[in-house]
């Protein structure tokens, strides 16, 4: 059976945490920061865990992720 390919877009955008959750960057910080409050911008820092349903789809794109 041939090897399965990992989707390049998925490996660049997502990481799998030690507990198996899919971690992603916060959405909503590409442009338009002027109209957002400072607290909104502050809360959008860092990464967040993806929902379980969406995480299952992303894990299917990365067949060799260790905690997939």
Swiss-Prot record:
This is Large ribosomal subunit protein bL35. GO terms for cellular component: cytosolic large ribosomal subunit. The keyword Ribosomal protein applies. HAMAP family: Ribosomal_bL35 (MF_00514). GO terms for biological process: translation. GO terms for molecular function: structural constituent of ribosome. Gene3D superfamilies: 4.10.410.60. Belongs to the bacterial ribosomal protein bL35 family. Keywords: Ribonucleoprotein, Ribosomal protein. NCBIfam families: rpmI_bact. The keyword Signal does not apply.
């Amino acid at each position: 059976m041939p090897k399965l390919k990992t989707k390049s877009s998925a490996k660049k955008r997502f990481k799998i945490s030690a507990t198996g959750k899919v971690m992603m960057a916060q959405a909503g910080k590409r442009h338009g920061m002027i109209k957002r409050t400072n607290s909104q911008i502050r809360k959008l820092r860092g990464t967040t865990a993806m929902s379980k349903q969406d995480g299952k789809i992303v894990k299917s794109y990365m067949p060799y992720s260790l905690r997939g």
